[in-house]
């Protein structure tokens, strides 16, 4: 039987993993309007815990980049079936690890800028500026990575092909702008939910 501290510890790992999975699913389905805000809400909710940030990023990339598994089999390149399977899974896990690492680093920035004090007691203007800066940092990071061969899909670009309205909005603010907007929405959902719990 699990004791309360073990249950709490499991939740700290389970929810970030679930958030990453929902985010990864959202980039490949028409349910992004439901899944992505929930995913980013979970990201913000656990952003003060470093391992939670890593778990979210790891599972987001693991699911959203699962198409890498379609590289298998690589037998036409001379690899055996087993070697091809190992190589393909290794590539996917490596990309997922990098995704987790990047979100982990972003989480460190969140910890430094945002979590030094209780966000629910901050004045709205300083809070908004800090959250906008953190969201902008993510968007700029995606923009920089998109210029390299090591970046295939992100929060901004992933949803555009499946939604004509987002595609139109992206013409005005770009994929990075969409990324910033989504992260901002995720934060305010987290903030409103947190305030509602405080006042219950």
Predicted stretch roles:
Residues 2-198:
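Membrane-embedded alpha-helical bundles of multi-pass enzymes
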